[in-house]
């Protein structure tokens, strides 16, 4: 299963379309992490589910981005989608990590900073009152609108693969 991840398009639906066109195969789903949610309405994909959240610049939400946070469940993993502004990610990831542990997420996808990021917290580490039973992955695809960066999440058996791409 493979997901194409976008954040922070800020009016550049064309960059999302270009990234989608450059994929070897059509992703199983598209995940959008806020700031440009209305751009999703201009993204033409057939039979590809889209899950999205609103960011701090999404005053009028798209039909897809009616919430600021979503939990998805795939391949035995709990995926937290959020923009990150509500957790102060520009100042650090501590609050977001604590929240992810509280809701049981082991894959955390966020935007807001426009900086591609991948951080892993090892299984067995303590986060707040929670001892992680599996690794926690924190991933920011960067800004598809400004820097042309995006992400890909792939599940292969027990493995979680997260990678960054650039136009």
Kindly give the residue locations of the regions a language model identified.
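Binuclear metal-dependent phosphoesterase catalytic core
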Residues: 17-18, 75, 98-103, 125-167
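Pre-active-site segment of Zn-dependent metallo-hydrolases
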Residues: 15-22, 81-83, 87-100
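Conserved beta-strand segments of alpha/beta enzyme cores
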Residues: 2, 49-51, 78, 137, ...
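N-terminal active-site segment of His-dependent metallophosphoesterases
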Residues: 1-50, 62-67, 148-149, 157-158, ...
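Short, acidic/polar N-cap/turn motifs at the starts of alpha helices
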Residues: 67-71, 115-116, 128, 150
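Active-site environment of divalent metal-dependent phosphoester hydrolases
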Residues: 10-15, 37-41, 57-62, 87-91, ...
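Active-site neighborhood of phospho(di)ester-bond hydrolases with catalytic His/Asp-centered motifs
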Residues: 5-7, 29-35, 51-56, 80-83, ...
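Helix-adjacent hinge/juxtasegments
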Residues: 49-90
């Amino acid at each position: 299963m493979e997901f194409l991840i976008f954040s922070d398009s800020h009016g550049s639906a064309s960059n999302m379309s270009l990234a989608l066109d450059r994929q070897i195969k059509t992703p199983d789903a598209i995940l959008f992490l806020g700031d440009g949610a209305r751009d999703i309405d201009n993204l033409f994909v057939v039979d590809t589910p889209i899950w999205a959240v609103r960011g701090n610049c999404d005053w009028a939400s798209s039909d897809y981005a009616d919430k600021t946070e979503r939990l998805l469940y795939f391949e035995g993993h709990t995926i937290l989608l959020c923009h990150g502004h509500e957790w102060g990610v520009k100042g650090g990831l501590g609050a977001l990590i604590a929240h992810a542990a509280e809701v049981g997420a082991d894959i955390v996808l966020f935007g807001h900073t426009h900086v591609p990021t991948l951080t892993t917290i090892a299984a067995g580490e303590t986060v707040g009152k929670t001892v992680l039973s599996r690794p926690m992955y924190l991933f920011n695809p960067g800004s598809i609108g400004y820097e042309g960066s995006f992400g890909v999440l792939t599940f292969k058996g027990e493995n979680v693969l997260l990678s960054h791409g650039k136009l």
